């Protein structure tokens, strides 16, 4: 794959939302239970900054996935910690793109001045947990039965990695 990573632009938002919405029905990735709209994600899109960006990954002008870095917990003392979200188009899943995307994030740590990365993953989402663990993330917390998806309670696993001192 000849992929390019770039900062997301407003015209990418429909593709970002489409990729996100494609994960909802599977009940493995997001706690949203119904599809979201482009309009409902405008504030989220606009709150990304140079230091906490939203990237798209594209090949031949087609968005294959996106990465969001967001501040953790919204308090000043946590400014060196980020929460990462990685979403991949259904046609691009299972081809190693997730590994490339997570490595891309880790490579940005110095330039974006973060030291710790967190991933919030449902406990039954073994592929995502394995991806993070492959990169040295550890299970820092398990929040048992905090989400209910179609009547089934699910755990939330917080995976963390300290990248640099």
Where are these regions (language model features)?
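Conserved beta-strand-loop-alpha-helix junction that forms the acyl-donor binding cleft
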Residues: 93, 119-129
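A short beta-loop-alpha structural element at the N-terminal edge
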Residues: 4-16
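Conserved GNAT-fold acetyl-CoA-binding loop/helix
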Residues: 17-44
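Conserved acetyl-CoA-binding loop-helix of GNAT-fold acetyltransferases
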Residues: 94-107, 129-134
């Amino acid at each position: 794959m000849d992929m390019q990573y770039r900062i997301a632009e407003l015209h990418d938002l429909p593709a970002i939302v489409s990729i996100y919405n494609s994960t909802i029905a599977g009940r493995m990735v997001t706690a949203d239970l119904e599809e979201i709209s482009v309009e409902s994600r405008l504030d989220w899109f606009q709150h990304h900054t140079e230091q906490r960006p939203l990237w798209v990954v594209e090949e031949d002008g087609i968005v294959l996935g996106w990465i969001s870095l967001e501040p953790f917990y919204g308090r000043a003392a946590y400014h060196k910690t980020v929460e990462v979200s990685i979403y991949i188009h259904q046609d691009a899943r299972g081809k190693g793109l997730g590994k490339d995307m997570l490595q891309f994030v880790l490579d940005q740590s110095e330039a974006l001045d973060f030291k710790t990365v967190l991933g919030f993953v449902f406990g039954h989402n073994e592929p995502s947990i394995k991806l993070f663990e492959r990169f040295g993330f550890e299970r820092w917390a398990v929040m048992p039965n905090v989400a209910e998806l179609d009547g089934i309670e699910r755990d939330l696993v917080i995976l963390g990695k300290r990248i640099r001192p």
